[in-house]
């Protein structure tokens, strides 16, 4: 018989473990519950406890990850690049309202929590020139 997870326990445990963005398999690993129990719990608490980033990817509502962290997990493999990286490094003076990333997958655009994330296709040979950076306690891939 499986134990019943309580929302406050789940929230506190995820925060204590530093899990701000997770998939159902991540949730299973953290709490040791079945896939069905995971799916039911996440579905039941998606309005109050979790933010659905996309199918199979969720964030805590109370302790949301930074946009850069979401950008790296939303559509992998990818790294933050183009206009967003140029603005972040102070190379262009304009404010950038879209997180732009490079990916080897097809070009896509997502809107999560009223924030736009754009992924531009590049060839596999060109998928380099990035480094890891700590943002909000989490590792993010960012163009050099």
Spans of features found by a protein language model:
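Nucleic-acid-binding surface
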Residues: 61-144
């Amino acid at each position: 018989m499986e134990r019943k997870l309580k929302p406050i326990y789940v929230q506190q445990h995820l925060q204590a473990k530093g899990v701000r963005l997770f998939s159902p398999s991540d949730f299973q690993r953290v709490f040791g519950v079945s896939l069905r129990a995971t799916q039911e719990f996440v579905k039941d608490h998606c309005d109050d406890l979790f933010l659905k980033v996309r199918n199979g990817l969720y964030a805590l509502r109370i302790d949301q990850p930074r946009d850069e962290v979401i950008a790296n997990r939303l559509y992998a493999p990818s790294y933050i690049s183009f206009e967003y990286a140029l603005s972040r490094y102070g190379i262009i003076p304009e404010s950038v309202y879209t997180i732009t990333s490079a990916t080897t997958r097809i070009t896509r655009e997502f809107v999560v929590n009223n924030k736009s994330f754009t992924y531009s296709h590049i060839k596999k040979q060109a998928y380099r020139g990035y480094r890891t950076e700590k943002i909000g306690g989490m590792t993010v891939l960012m163009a050099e």
